[in-house]
């Protein structure tokens, strides 16, 4: 999903900066985008800690002489343990903490940089890649919805908008057909939020 989002915005003429912990996937996406435009760069992150993200944004600002106008947080959902599992608590806490920390650390660092400039937008996008990953979608959607609304209230005085895009839950019967359509809708909704200067504090469903 992240690769598809990146190539979509490259086709629209945007200058795109890619970052991820998955180095091979990151490089593959870079070359896919680079075949369409030379206005693309990538940075490999060892983790999503505040220090790593601050270093990344410092390098971006040095290379491009400005902070990013748009931050798209792409969050793949993962299956969460059930309440009836034998020992679900540690896995559940780790997975939710990973989602929350990456969301918060990126958004916090970018919003601080944007406050020194004119305006910006943060879009939190939830997706899933397999049928098994759907079990975590409700929790991920709820988390993104809450963060999006509260952060929009905090950042409105700084002219920074925050929006969210989340998938609806599909039945197993139409999973194959639905995912292709839903991915296109997620991308369209993300583009809409980026381009609509009056959209903030809300979440769109695909």
Name each model-derived stretch:
Residues 33-51:
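Rossmann-fold cofactor-recognition segment
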Residues 1-17:
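Canonical Rossmann dinucleotide-binding motif of NAD(H)/NADP(H)-dependent dehydrogenases/reductases
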Residues 12, 63-66, 81-82, 105-118, ...:
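A short helix-coil junction within the Rossmann-fold of NAD(P)-dependent oxidoreductases
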Residues 101, 157, 164-165, 176-206:
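C-terminal helical subdomain
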Residues 48, 94-102, 181:
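Glycine-rich NAD(P)-binding loop of the Rossmann-fold in SDR/ketoreductase-type enzymes
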Residues 14-28:
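Conserved glycine-rich Rossmann-like NAD(P)H-binding loop of the short-chain dehydrogenase/reductase
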Residues 76-77, 85, 91-95, 102-104, ...:
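Catalytic loop of short-chain dehydrogenase/reductase
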Residues 36-39, 56-73, 79-80, 161, ...:
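A glycine-rich helix->loop->beta "capping" turn
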């Amino acid at each position: 999903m992240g690769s598809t989002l990146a190539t979509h915005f490259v086709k629209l003429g945007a200058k795109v900066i890619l970052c991820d912990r998955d180095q091979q996937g990151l490089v593959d996406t870079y070359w896919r985008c680079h075949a369409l435009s030379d206005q693309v760069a990538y940075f490999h992150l060892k983790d999503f800690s505040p220090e790593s993200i601050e270093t990344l944004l410092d390098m971006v600002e040095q290379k491009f002489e400005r902070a990013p106008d748009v931050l798209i947080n792409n969050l793949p959902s993962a299956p969460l343990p059930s309440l009836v599992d034998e020992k679900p608590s540690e896995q559940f806490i780790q997975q939710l903490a990973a989602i929350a920390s990456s969301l918060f650390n990126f958004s916090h660092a970018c919003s601080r940089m944007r406050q020194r400039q004119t305006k910006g937008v943060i879009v939190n996008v939830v997706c899933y890649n397999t049928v098994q990953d759907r079990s975590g979608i409700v929790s991920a959607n709820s988390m993104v919805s809450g963060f999006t609304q509260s952060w929009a209230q905090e950042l409105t005085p700084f002219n920074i908008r925050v929006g969210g895009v989340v998938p609806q839950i599909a039945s197993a019967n139409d999973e194959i057909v639905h995912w292709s359509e839903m991915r296109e809708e997620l991308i369209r909704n993300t583009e809409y939020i980026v381009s609509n200067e009056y959209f903030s504090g809300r979440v769109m469903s695909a």
